[in-house]
Regions:
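Short active-site neighborhood of thiol/selenol oxidoreductases, capturing the structured segment around
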Residues: 59-69
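Boundary at the C-terminal end of the N-terminal hydrophobic targeting segment
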Residues: 35-37
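Structural micro-motif
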Residues: 115-130
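Thiol-based oxidoreductase modules, predominantly thioredoxin-like and allied folds used
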Residues: 90-111
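N-terminal secretory signal peptides
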Residues: 1-19, 26-32
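Non-catalytic, surface beta->alpha helical segment in thiol-disulfide oxidoreductase systems
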Residues: 131-164
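Typically the conserved alpha-helix immediately C-terminal to a functionally engaged Cys/Sec
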Residues: 75-88
Length: 168
């Protein structure tokens, strides 16, 4: 096997350990920052009543994802399921963040933080997806946790179909 010498001194017959700087340059060359920048995001909820109104005009439920920064299951749900559904089906999907002091106008018009809203819903696990219909009523049971990746999409599709039927 051939070792790659990145130009640093090494003992004969052994590759030099790459410096942090050289490793970063190598990663930059792979285009990883572009992949990180392409991380699909969901709109952050600002006014739930407004988001719900848009969804209902489209005859769709409002999907709210409760997320937590750094949560790998949240990232997987967002990137693999919710962002594509939003992009491809035009669903109204918004994100509310645990441990966030960002202001949010709730369904009644009262202003509180994302954290306060999550507490009022009694959500304790991220990710949790809620499906809202007319009068801000939850249409189906919440989809809580990451589940197994192979089955999450089926659970999400099933809940969405049931929520759509409840709106009809």
């Amino acid at each position: 096997m051939t070792a790659i010498d990145l130009g640093e001194s090494a003992r004969p017959g052994r590759a030099a350990p790459p410096s942090r700087r050289r490793m970063m340059c190598a990663l930059l060359g792979l285009g990883l920052p572009a992949a990180w920048a392409a991380d699909p995001q969901l709109p952050v909820a600002t006014a739930l009543a407004d988001h719900l109104k848009v969804a209902l005009q489209r005859k769709e439920p409002l999907l709210v994802m409760v997320s937590l920064a750094g949560c790998p299951f949240c990232k997987a749900v967002r990137e693999s399921h919710l962002a594509p559904m939003q992009r491809e089906q035009g669903l109204q999907v918004v994100q509310v963040d645990m441990m966030s002091g960002q202001p949010l106008r709730d369904f009644r018009g009262a202003v509180q933080t994302h954290t306060q809203q999550i507490e009022s819903w009694a959500v304790r696990i991220a990710p949790t997806v809620l499906f809202f219909g007319r009068d801000a009523v939850e249409l189906v049971p919440r989809l809580t946790g990451g589940y197994l990746p192979d089955f999450y999409g089926a659970y999400l599709d099933q809940r969405l179909e049931t929520a759509r039927k409840a709106l009809a």
